[in-house]
Amino acid sequence: MLWSPLVVGGATAVLANAQIAAIRNSEINSGTDPRTHYYGLVDDANGQHFMRGRASGIPAGPQPDTVASGPCGIPAGFAGDQDQSYADWYGAHELGHTYGRFHPGFPPGAQDASDPAFPYANGQLSNADRKYVGYDVGDPQLGLEPKVMSGTTHHDVMTYADRQWVSAYTFEAIRQRLADEDAQFAPPVA
C-alpha cells in the first residue's frame, strides 16, 4: 500500500479521489485484486480543514474502480457520534455509494431521497414491527462488548442521521453487488 500525505482544503474531495484512483490504478496494474474498493481518509487537521466525504460516482452496476474519500478526526459537534471519530460512519456511508447505494432521504431536507425504494420509515433499520435489529459482535481484545441496536431508533448508514448501522436492505444490496463483482472478474471457464 502506498502512502501519500495529501493536504486538501474543505471542498477538495475531487482531488483526493483523483489521487486515490491513481493509486488504485497503479496497484491493480501491479496485480492487486480488481474487485478491491478504495477509500481514502483525509485528516481534518484538528477541525481546521474538514472535507465533506464524496464518492467518485454511484455506479448502477459492478464497478469497483469507483473510489471515495472522507474526513477523519475527532468530531466537534456531531450529534450522535459515540466513539470520538467520524471516520467509521463516514467511511461506511461513502463506501456504500461505491457499491451503488443511494440516500433514503433522512433526515428530510438534510439529504436527497435518491433511493425511493428504501423500505423503512425515517431511514431506520426496521419498521415498527421490529423485524430487524443491528448487531455488533464487539471485540474482546479491545474491550468492546457485543451489542444489539434497536431497529426503530438506529438509522441506516446511507442516512445523515445519528446512531447508524447497516440495515438489512443495504446489507443485502451490497452483498448482491459483491456477488456481481465476483462474477464480473471470474476467470473464464474452459
Task: Identify what each model region corresponds to.
Residues 1-118:
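Active-site-proximal segment of zinc-dependent metalloprotease catalytic domains
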